[in-house]
Amino acid sequence: MDAEMAMGESFAYYWETQRYLESEELDSMYLPTQDDSNYESSSPDGSHSSSAPAPAAVGGDAAAAVAGSGGGMTTMMMGGGGGGGDDAGGANKNILMERDRRRKLNEKLYALRSVVPNITKMDKASIIKDAIEYIQRLQAEEQQMLREVAALESAAAASAAPAAANPFAGLGADEEHEYGHHHPSSSSERTKKVKRALSVSSISDALLAAAAPAPPVEIQELRVSEVGDRVLVVSVTCSKRRDAMARVCRALEELRLRVITANITSVAGCLMHTLFVEVDHMDSVQMKQMVEAALSQLVATGSPLSSMSY
C-alpha cells in the first residue's frame, strides 16, 4: 500500500517536470532583453544557473532532467545573443549605405537644377522632367542651326561653281581664245592668269583716266586784302568742278606762303578758298600779282582772271 502511494507521487512529480520543461523551451525562443532577470550568475566561475524555484521534492531523475534543461537553455541564450548582434550590425550598415545613396542622388539633383533655366517645381520628378524638356529643346535648336549652315554652304558652292567651270566669263572672245588655247594648263593656273590680266587692265584704265587732261579751272573771283600788320587775306572763288579746288591748293602751295589758317567753303555751286598769310616785305598788290601768276596756268582761255578787281 505504501509502495503504491510512493509510485503515485513519483508519477505526479514526473508530469509536473515535463510541463515545466516545455514552458522553459517556449520561453527560450524569444531573445533576452537587458532587463531580463530570469538568469543571473551566482557562481564564482561565471556559470549560469536558473533562478526559477525547483520543485520541493523530486526524485533523482527529475532533478537531473531539470539541471540538464537549465544548461541547455543557457547555451541557447548565449548562441541567440551572438546572432542578434550580427543582425544589428548588418542593419546599421544597410542604413548607412542608403543614406549615402540618397545624399549622392540629392547632390546630382541640385547640380541638374542649377543648369536648367526653367524649373517649374522643386520636387525630384519635376526637376527631371524639366531637364528632359530642356535637353530636347537644345537638340532641336542644334538641328535647326545645322540645317541653316548646310543651306549656306550649298548656296556658296552653287555660286562658286559657274566661276570655276568658266574662268573666262569676264573676258572677251579674243582673250578667252588666247588664254584658253595657248596656255592649256590646269584650271587653277588659267584662273590666276585671268585674274592677273584683269588686274592689269584695271590698272591701265586708272592710268589712262589720270593721264586724261583735267578740265580747266574757272576762277570767278580773286581778292587780296590787308587785315593787320604783315597779315594778308587771299580769297579765291572758283566753279565746282572735278579736282578744281585741289588744283588751286597745289598752285598756292608752290608759292611757299606762310599760311596762318585756311578754310574752304562751298556756296551755290562755287568753292571759296580763304587763306590768312603772314608776309614780311610785301603789300597786297604784290601778293595779288604773285597769286595771279600761279593761277594763270589753271584758268581756261577767256577766263576773267585779268579783269578781277583787287
From Swiss-Prot:
GO MF terms here are: DNA-binding transcription factor activity; protein homodimerization activity; transcription cis-regulatory region binding
Q: Biased composition, Low complexity: where in the chain?
A: 41-57
Q: Which InterPro entries match?
A: ACT-like_dom_sf, bHLH-TF_ACT-like_plant, bHLH_dom, HLH_DNA-bd_sf, TF_AMS/ICE1/BHLH6-like
Ranges for region Basic motif: 89-102
Instruction: Specify the signal sequence span.
Output: none
Q: Kindly name one Pfam family recorded for this protein.
A: HLH
- Example GO biological process: phosphate ion homeostasis
Q: Which residues form the bHLH domain?
A: 89-138
Q: Where is this region: Helix-loop-helix motif?
A: 103-138
Q: Which Gene3D superfamilies match?
A: Helix-loop-helix DNA-binding domain
Q: What is the protein's quaternary organization?
A: Forms homodimers. Interacts with SPX4.
PANTHER family named among the record's database cross-references: TRANSCRIPTION FACTOR BHLH35, TRANSCRIPTION FACTOR SCREAM2-RELATED
* Other comments on record: Overexpression of BHLH6 promotes shoot and root phosphate accumulation, and root hair growth and acid phosphatase activity under phosphate sufficiency.
Q: Which family, according to UniProt? A: Belongs to the bHLH protein family.
Can you name this protein?
Answer: Transcription factor BHLH6
Species: Oryza sativa subsp. japonica (Rice)
Q: What is the lineage of its organism?
A: Eukaryota, Viridiplantae, Streptophyta, Embryophyta, Tracheophyta
